[in-house]
Amino acid sequence: MSEASGKEHPLSILMNEAYQVFTDLGFEIATGPELESEWYNFDVLNVPKDHPARDMQDTFWIKEKEGNVLRTHTTATIARAMELAGKEGRIPAAFISVGKVFRNEATDVTHEMQFYQIDGGMIGENISLADLKGVLSHFYKKMLGEDVEIEFRPSFFPFTEPSIEVFAKWKGQWLEMMGAGMAHPNVLKNIGLNPNKHQCLLFGGGLDRIAMIKWGIPDIRFFYQGDLRLNQF
């Protein structure tokens, strides 16, 4: 009997597919630290000091490094990349990042304390919400098939204005996939850019949920339990 061999994790497969979709559109891959400063994780993104996302029950704060958190999203990485692009005079620019994020929350079939998030941003002149919807529609069709049902709904986030949420049909119900919108003027100011000159679209959501729909995996927690049934990938 032959020995079992290791295989690429489905989330690694999906990460590479997602990167390919966006690099084909001209996006650059951005990387950043998992141990993030409060400034980039919250302040840059116009998150108020009293916002519940900053609470201990939602965020892992690091006692040994005051003012640092385990990043709750990779939007912080996109903010860093856009800030550097502005300093180097490389605008227009577009960035994509996939990485581990951490939330101090209860787990269930669609929520986990650690998961992979995909975040992106595009900055330049004359960028609109129509561009954002076009980019995201293209992405989900490439990842989930041309017949995937996608819906955009108005929402609110402190770092975007206007804001939308993206939903996909899964098991006959709408599953929230991503938050997105046009960067709030304060976000652009915080990274040293002029909101009267530049517009920026931002989007971010769980990579794990895309995998659940793509491969019919019923529980997000399976990805992190060493389940041997994932060997099929």
Place the predicted regions along the sequence by residue.
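TRNA-recognition modules of translation machinery and tRNA-sensing kinases, especially anticodon-binding
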Residues: S2-F233
